Structures are given as structure tokens and as C-alpha cells.
Amino acid sequence: MEKLTVLILVATVLLMIQVLAQSGGDKHLKRRPKQYATKRLSALMRGHRQCTPQNVQCEEDDECCSNLECKCSTVPDCNFPKCRP
């Protein structure tokens, strides 16, 4: 059921992009829905994910919440990096 829902959402987004691209609108207005649709589709394919908050141990930047990086603040080659700004 979840895959069907995602498929319907993807089809809707693609149809919306096609309709907007065929209309005689401004180029800037055409580009924005495509950017939004790409980001939304990417988020749907990845599924729900929780980010790692600040000062919590991490392994790579992708798992940290936005505006945070997985790094050590004291030693460059530490064993336990944390999500930090």
C-alpha cells in the first residue's frame, strides 16, 4: 500500500511538471516546481529519517541534522566524532 501511495505521488508530481512546462508561463516559474518536485521525490524515496542532533555521536555528515557536520572539535583523528555546527 505504501509503494502504491508513493507511485501515485510521483505520477502526480510528474503530471504537474508536464502541465506547467507546457503552459506559457515564466521560465523562473517553470524551474521552481521542477526543483521542488526533485527534492520531494528524493525525500519520498529515502523515506522518513530522523537526524542526529547536536553533540551526539555520529559516523558521517548525512546523518546529522541540518547545519551540522560530523566532526571532532578537539582532536582531528578522534574515535568519537559528534554532530557539530
From Swiss-Prot:
Keywords: Disulfide bond, Pyrrolidone carboxylic acid, Secreted, Signal, Toxin. Coiled coil: none annotated. Residues 24-49 form a propeptide. Residues 1-23 form the signal peptide. It comes from the Eukaryota. InterPro entries: Conotoxin. One of its GO terms (molecular function) is toxin activity. Expressed by the venom duct. Contains 4 disulfide bonds. It is found in: Secreted. The keyword NAD does not apply. The cysteine framework is XV (C-C-CC-C-C-C-C). Belongs to the conotoxin O2 superfamily. This is Conotoxin Lv15a. It comes from Conus lividus (Livid cone).
